[in-house]
Structures are given as C-alpha cells and as structure tokens.
C-alpha cells in the first residue's frame, strides 16, 4: 500500500522538501497537484524525516498542499525493439509525436557490468574517418571523449560517426541542446540514412537540470540491454558532458552542498566515471562503445570537466580548427588492433605520416619567421598540403584500406622512399611504383 504525504515544507528552485518516512535515495515519487495535474520527482537526499526531491519539469504551480506518493522504485525507461528509430525526453517520454513506446520498464541506475564477464577489447569500430581509423583507432568497448574547442561543429562530427560506423545500433544522448541542435540531429539522421538503427534521448536547454542528469543513464541502460539480451554492438554518443556536469553543479548548489573546484560538486569525478565505466565488451555477447563530446570553456584543457574526464577515459580526440588534431589526440587501445586486425603496414605508415607532418609544422614556423627554406623544408610543406587535404579533412569518407593506400601515394608524391623512415620490406611491398618523385 502506498502512503500519501501532503506536508511539503519547502519549495526551492526545482527542489521540494517533504516530511516522509521510508524513502530511499533515487526513489521515484509522483506529485498530484490540486489542479489535477501530476508530475514526477526523484529523491536526492534525506535527513531524518525530511526528504528532498528534484521535481521533473520544475516546481511552477506547486503548492504545499499537493500530494506526494513514493512509488517504491527508481526511475525507469521503456526498453524494447519498438525503441529503435524513436526520440525520447529526459524522463523517457516520446517527443517525436509517434505515440507510446511499447516494451518492458528497466531501471536506469544499475551497477557497471560484471568484470568477470568482460573480455579484452580486440575488434576495431570503423568510422571511415581517416584521422580516427588510421591514426587513433576506435576499439570496440572503448570509452573516449571528443575534446571540442569553442565554435567547433562537434555535432556534425558525431552525426558522421553515427552514419558511417559499422555498429549495429546507435544511441544518442543529447544534453542541453538548443532547438537548432535538436533539429540538426533529427534532420541529419534522416538525411544520412541511419535513423532506422538509432535511438535518441534528448534534453533541451529549457528542460529541468535533473532530466539532463538522467540522459546518460537512460542511454546506457538501453545500450546494456541491447548488448546483453540481443548480442548487439552498440555505439553510444553523448553530447555535451560539460552540460551534464553543469546540471550536477546547479543541483548541488540548490542543495547547499559545499562546492569543489570552480563550483562543481566534489563527486564530479565519480559521477563521470560511473557513466564512462559502462563501456564493455561482453564475452559471448555484444558490446558498448562510448564516445562523448566534452566542450572546453575558453579552450581550457584544465577545466574540471575535461581534466577529470582525461583520467577516466582511454584517450581523447581533440577537435580544433575543424579537424581532429593529431598531436592532441590519443587512443590508448589502438595497439590492440593496429597490425592485428588491420594491415601489416598500418602502424609504420601512420607513425611516418605523423612524424613528417610534425616536421612540416616546424618548417611552416620557419617560413613564417622569414627564414630561408631548404629543399627538405619545401618537400615537407608540399607534403603537409596533400596530407591535410586528403586525410585530415573531416569531409573525407573512405575505408581504412583506401586511407592507407592514399597515405602511401602522398609519401611517394612528396619524398624518395629512403626519406620516410619505413622498413624496407614494407617499402618494397606497398610503395607505389607508378608515382614520380617530386
């Protein structure tokens, strides 16, 4: 039997305090208003009989005489095959105008996957973006952020990854989205043709902060069910984790918690890690690969959100000047697949290209300072132009094998074979014989 409480003692922002007994942390409650409307709330903390709840949708119109009913369960989301192709809000309600989703309710606050059932990652997730596939491979079950500078079009990059990946299902969690961003996600998913394998959980900038906090949990709970029950390889795309952290900060300030670095709660690291650690490759099952966008306010890599994220994840993609910067990017799992599930020349070729591109940057600096350029400097600058156009551009959409072939052609068009520092047996096998040296 559910107990009804009618003594709301405090209303502050999106929080209410009610005198109640037996409430549990994270428990869901229904609020029945005197005007007949109802809304949901989640227990954030309790002190003796004083229970603090975060109200979904805000407290506007709420009165101290409204009825609060604790439901005895945590927040749930509907899971089933009918979820594919749908768009849902931060509380799991459809927002695409296509009716209710049918399926089984599942809890969203579940522990990370049993480590005993995890296996060492061994497969590559293809994106057809050379700066990822060739230089910083995305590995199945990897958790990796995109550190985005101000003004970068990270949403377009996410949409390209979603459209070009070989994952079975793509789940997108959008947090703090403007209406323009939300419309872009919907239109691009249809234009690029992956809406039939995509699920979107969307929190808009005008929605309550608590709904923003729930988005990653809903996306990852559904991803885990697809991976475990249906052996699907799921790619989860979350944007923007800085908005997620800001929502945590807003809730913590409203609750009068003592702030830590730059006003963020002291639990920020744990809150981020709890979500990222859901990435998993399951023995005799599917997998969850997680890519998130973390915007850097003021391009500050030491900001608490990217700083904490870097300690949790397995590398990062650094988006700068509308390119994935090869010097700021790193995949800590790429050695598990390079040369093992990819071509034998992959590692040596990628290392040579990046080394020569780094040298070309130094040559560009010498040219900018008015130094006389050597013939080697001129070769490097010509190489850099080809490299940036044919491999670094985010508009390039080619499979890994073609990217490797293009890499060899760029080297052959710019240098003699003995100048690139690659093993002779690979040179003999892959160096284009038809290319003329310049």
From Swiss-Prot:
One of its GO terms (molecular function) is ATP binding. CDD domains: ATP-synt_V_A-type_beta_N, V_A-ATPase_B. GO terms for biological process: proton motive force-driven plasma membrane ATP synthesis. Pfam families: ATP-synt_ab, ATP-synt_ab_N, ATP-synt_VA_C. Coiled coil: none annotated. Keywords: ATP synthesis, Hydrogen ion transport, Ion transport, Transport. Produces ATP from ADP in the presence of a proton gradient across the membrane. The V-type beta chain is a regulatory subunit. Belongs to the ATPase alpha/beta chains family. NCBIfam families: PRK02118.1, PRK04196.1. This is V-type ATP synthase beta chain. It comes from Chlamydia felis (strain Fe/C-56).
